[in-house]
Amino acid sequence: MTIQECYASIGGDFEGVMSRLMKPSSVAKFTLMFPMDDSFSSLKKAYEAGEIRPAFLAAHSLKGMAVNLGFTDLYRAASIVTEEYRDGEVSDRIDEEMKQCEAEYEKVIQAIAAYAADRTDA
């Protein structure tokens, strides 16, 4: 699997991230580092504890990582969660929004794991 195929499997914006990082090897390097970021685990922990400010900060961080790496669907889901927490008032939609964010996160993590296990562009 190439890094382009990895991005295609998640509907990622490979061309957009290439415009920032310039080389497929750089895209691969930063993509492979993404699972080590703790933004999603921090978000989930804060969400489960009902901690609004930490949840906002973690969601905002996840959103930034996702947009910079071209993970479009994860970016959209994290953006919704970020806005949910922004003003400190959480609606009854948060459970469904978190489920969607987690599903998009897992999709990205699984694609990266598949890429890491079967790289053809290393």
Regions found by a protein language model. Give the residues of each.
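Alpha-helix N-cap/helix-start motif at coil-to-helix transitions, marked by capping-box chemistry
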Residues: A8, M33-F34, T72-Y75
